[in-house]
Amino acid sequence: MLIQDYLDICDPVLTFDRFMGEIELEKYLKNIPQHYTGRLRYDPVSMLKTVLFGFMANGYISLRELEDQCKVNLRFMYLMDHQAPSYRTFGYFVNEVLADSIEEIFQDINKKIFETEHVDLQHLYIDGSKFEANANKYSWVWKKATEKSRYRLFGKITTLFEEINEELSCTGMKLCINSEYAPEYLKEAAEQYAEVWQINEAMFVHGSGHRKTTQQRHYEKLKEYAAKLEEYVEKIKICGENRNSYSKTDHSATFMRIKTDYMGNDQLLPAYNVQVGIADEYIAVVDVNQYRSDMDCFIPLMNKFYTTYGFYPKYPVADAGYGSYNNYIFCEQHGMEKYMKFTMFKKETTDKKYHEDPFRAVNFPIGEGGIMRCPNGKSFYLQYRKNVKGNKYGRQEEVYQCEDCSGCPYAEQCKKTDKNRTVRINRELTAMHQEVIENLESIQGALLRMNRSIQAEGTFGIMKNDRWYKRIVRRGIKSVLLEVFLVSIGHNLYKYHNKQKKVAAAA
C-alpha cells in the first residue's frame, strides 16, 4: 500500500501538498550549486516542502526534529518519499538555499492563499510583540556608558600626551593634544615614540622585583589606550544611531523590557520586536525590528506591505503604541485613514471629567483675534515656537504664556508654580487626535477595534501558546528574519488548512 492510503482525505499533509503543487517551487531553488561527485542529492523541492510542512504542523521545528520526523512520521515520509536527510543536510538547505529566497516564498504563498480565500487587504490589523533573543541575559553593552568611558579615556590620553611631550621636549617631537582622538592616531604615536627611543619590546621587564623604565610605561600605555579606544569605537559602531544597547552574544539583539519577566526584577532582556499585519486572520506582512518602541516600526511595516502588494491598506488599525505625529502624517501622505489609537485615547474617551476639564489648554476658548483665554478670562500670548526633537516632518509646538496669573481664584486647580502659567500646544496634532477619536468611536471603528484585538493579538496568542513559539532560536538579524518568515508561512498554511477543513465539514 502507498503511504497516502494510510492518510485521511482531509489530512494536513494532503491539503499542503495539493496547495504547494499549484506554486512553482523550482524558481526558488535555481541557485543551488551543482555537484559532480559523491552521493545523489536529495530532491530540493521535497526538501522545501518538508521544511515548510514542519513549520505548518509544529509551529516551530528544529533541524533534529525534522530528521527524526522523516524517520518515523508518515506525513514526512510521504513528502520525502521514504528518504531521511540528516539534520546537517536540513541545516545547509535552510541556511544556505532558503536564506535569500524565503521572503519571496512567503509573498508568493500569501498571494496564492489570498487569491483563493478572497482576503481583504484594505483592512490591516497591526500588532507587535517582543520575542526574547537567543543571547545571554547579562551580556549587555550600553551605548551611553561606552561613550562616557570613551570620554574619560580621552582625558587620560591627554594627560599621557602632556607627559610624553614634556619627556620629548629635547628631541623636537611633539604629539598633538585634542579633545578627541582616533585609535589610528594613537597607534601612529606609539610607532613614532618607539622610533625616537629605539624601543625593543623584547627588553621589557614585567613582574615584581622589576622596575619599568619611563619609556616602557609610556609605550605600554599608548598601546593599551589605542586598543581600548578601538574597542569603544567598535561597540558604538555596532549599536548604530538608532539603538542604545546590544548583546555581546548576539550583536543584533537589543535590550528591551518584555512582558514575560520570569526573573521577577523588571530587568531588560535581549530581544527582537516582531511586527505583523493581519488580514482575515492571515499574516499579510511581517517584519523584525531592533527598535524598542512600536511607533518606529509602523512606517517600515507599511513600506514593506507596499513593496509586496503595490498599494497601502486603506484602514491600518493599531493600538496606542503606534499613534504618533509622524505616523499620522505618513497615513495622510499615502491615502490611509487614521485608525491608530494615541497614548491618551482611553482616558480621552472614557474619563468624562478629564475630557471636559476646563483647565486643559485644549479646552480653552478662543476669543476674538484667535486669542486663547483661560477660565478666568485672562489672555494667553504666543512666546515662541519650539521644534520637537526627533520629528522628521518638522513638527513644532507653540508655547503660550498667560498675561497675568496674580490673584487668580483658580490658581490651585490651574497651575503648579508661582509664575504665570505656560502651555504647549500643537493644534495640528490635536486636530489629528480628534479625527482618530471620531474614526474609532464610530460603528465601523468599534468593529475594527474589536477585530484587531481578535485577529492581531490572537495571532501572537496562537503562535506563543498554541504552537509554542515563544523565543527566537537563531542569532543575527538576517537569520532571525529567516526564522520568523518560516514561522509565518507555517502559521498561514495552518490557518488555510483549518479553513479548508471547516468548508469541507460544512459541505
Q: What residues fall within each predicted segment?
A:
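Basic, short loop/linker segments at the boundary and entry of helix-turn-helix/winged-helix-like folds
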Residues: 9-49, 55, 427
